[in-house]
Amino acid sequence: MSKKSFGSGYFGEWIEDEFGLPAYRYTCDQINDPKAIIPLNEKLRSNKEHLHQIGNDRLVGVASNFGYVQVRQDEGCPKFLNDYDPEQNQFAGGFGYLVDGENLLSTFYSGNGDSFNRIFGIGYLRKIVKGHDLSVDQVIFAPYGDDPLLISQVTISNNTEQSKNLRWIEYWGCKMFQFSALAYYTAFGQKDLSLMNKKRREFSSKFSHEFSLIGNSGLLEAKYFQGRKDENKREIPKPVYESKKSPKTFLVSLNGPIEGFSTNGFDFFGKGGVELPDGVKGTLPSNLDTVDDKSAMIVEQRVHLKPKESRTLYFAYGYLPKGVYLDQVLKDYKKEIDNQWDYSSESWKRNIVKLSISKEAWVEREIIWHNYYLRSAMTYDDYFNEHILSQGHVYQYIMGVQIAARDPLQHILPFIFCEPKIVKEIIRYILKTVKEDGEIPYGVIGNGKIIPLPFFPSDLELWLLWVTSEYILATRDKEFLEEVIPTYPLYGKEANTSTVLKMLILCYNHFTEITGTGKHGLQRLSTGDWNDGAVMGHVPEEKHEEVRIHGESILNTTMAIYVLSKFADLLSIIENYDMVDEVIKYAESLKKAVKAQWNGQWFKRAWFNDDLGWIGDEILWLEPQPWAIIGDAVDNDWIPILINNIDKLLRNSSKIGARLLSKGIDVMKKEVGVRANGGIWPSINGTLIWALSCVNSEMAWDEWKKNTLAFHAEAFPDIWYGIWSGPDTYNSDLSIYHGQTHFFEYFITGDPKDKKIMLEDPFGVNWTDFPVMNLHPHAWPLYNIIHLIGAKFTEEGIEFSPILPKEKYNFSSPILGFKKTKEGYSGWYAPLVEGNWKVTLNLDKDELKQFIRLEINEKENEISFIEDQIVFYGRSEQNKPLRWKIKKS
């Protein structure tokens, strides 16, 4: 038996598909294999279900190992267009049935077939089913780009010596399922999360369905709330918790007429259910009468195959955004449908961040996969009229909340180097939520509704200032700062406009003047910073308001030191020198205040009030330590002490990244080693990798690897999540469930005491209820490559301090390239505007002496050494990057 690729885990293996892209061949029989089962709330999802993401810039297909696909679409409100509710004969869609009169082949996985192969690919789910000398190869893929549809490509093969008359029946449901946060809050308040889905389905049941034929090729479905067709005519958008509008959906054959259809999914499946539907036994009724919850879109094509012959059918399933017509959506697909999967797959290779390292092929595979998973999670919000990269995971798919504002800003960091358009859209999205005084709200629910929680994190403005500053410094896109955008609530009499720059300054003023500093000169904490549990899970409830007023955050302070230095660079580029001085002065005051909180071993974590005092004096909290290093707030003689403590107390015992705390804290409501009480967080470890890259190259590289999917799969091969996607936090070695993510023990024990713990939790959901498609474990490994090559953008250009401890590697992206070989270094810089740029290489003294040749834009130049640096200048032009090489001979 051949050895699996590194990082494959138990449930299948990594392969390279026919397009040269990574894919995961899933081989687990989840129905009969106990290793497939994880503890979760089975009223929400099956404990045997494993999920893969197939998406583009407009929608997300959540693909199940059972073979069905649910389509997430966010216009109106985030929702599934096609619910999976077996009790009501609703099975989502994306599968079908091949019938030869006697036998049946299904692309829904039942565990009973002769052969059923599944491949989770970049942009697709592939299912290859064989039996009765017939085979079906079905690929459900999301075409690359911004089109609101999936393609079902079905290749049918007759492997017999006789001709066959066959029927292919394609199924897609159309009962929607809104991710209503209102339903979540109601169920949580009643201490029964099973009510959440019940209430969401009750809301969906208030919509009637109306079907029409699309010529002889398919079906178009419209929904109306309680039969009122005038609901869709409202002109001025208003923020809502739940939307009474839903887009039209369609199912269309792209290469041939349909020869039967049904709109009644309930009767189609009948008593036989999904494995042996009643409807396959005879002809489909071909009527449009169904208007209630029984609705579905089912179409049939008939195929005559000669012996050994194959034929491919194509179907499009999708929705129509407001103002978009079906012909517009389908025009290109009807013309060149045979090449669409190839084109889409090839497109995923473009405009991405890449890293290849000699003798470590798994690194390049993982990087390509992260690029895909990050971008394919994108959806479109029609209230803010921008694309969004929400955190996904349990937050979006279970609770129905787009939180927190800092998260989409982290997710776009890698796109600075490959897709500026996406970066600007997310920045605009966040700016459009900003309140009149410059406060950024915690998050958004429903359609444009600011989340109604008494929670006011004090760090959110920092993330906006940082990401925007990094974007401007990298791309030199100063024009973006003058772009005019609408301000919240965007529509009606209260609507207004401002520029990006004015909004940034407004947010800066909120951070420095309204949030401001406390008695120790540190940034105030409010109800929390990055860590929601710093106050809510740590401070007695009766003290919350006092801590909100007086508390101070060392995490916010250390982060602000760095962020404000970058914001000052941005202001300097646009020659706003008066404000530059103000920002630098404020940052310097924070640096002085932080240094006063060094306890001889590490920096403290936070100050609450005079009664509760400091936290983080006896226990090492990871969060503020990396930012202190990044912001140069650590004295040189403190650095070895701090790094040694991080390594010894947080890193050494973990195979999958540093944990948040050196030991658990009893007063926290969460189990030790879980979530904020000492769990492992990729978003925090991303800052740790960055900090380590400044002081310890070997440790930085080691920490980067520990936080990869491959290392999680090697350390915990029997945990399915963490192989191709994962959650935002894993349990650390302080937990008895190391390597898993959070779940309530009640779902193992059934003990009433454990149920009580669950009911007292501030969220009430298992992270295992939807343990994948969080974007932090995909975004941070990509962004951290910049730190491994030591790239830093400055006012004048780009600076490199390469630390990756490898003889040969190659980093590339549309904006920036950097390559190391035995002969030397080379690279390019391609900002969005023309200019002359300063390039600085910081190298070891012994290495510096070996270089004797410099090429700039293919012309020989003299090498200029300034202390331990090579410094030169070069010009980039439109479509012509600044290219350079330094060589040893």
Per-range role (PLM):
Residues 401-408, 412-523, 554-557, 561, ...:
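Aromatic-rich carbohydrate-recognition surfaces in CAZymes
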Residues 169-171, 441-442, 559-667, 705, ...:
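Catalytic cores of carbohydrate-active enzymes
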Residues 7-15, 55, 60-130, 223-280, ...:
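An extended acidic
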Residues 143-146, 150-280, 331-349, 723:
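Polysaccharide-binding surfaces and accessory modules of carbohydrate-active proteins
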Residues 100-149, 274-299, 368-372:
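Extended, loop-rich substrate-binding clefts of extracytoplasmic carbohydrate-active enzymes
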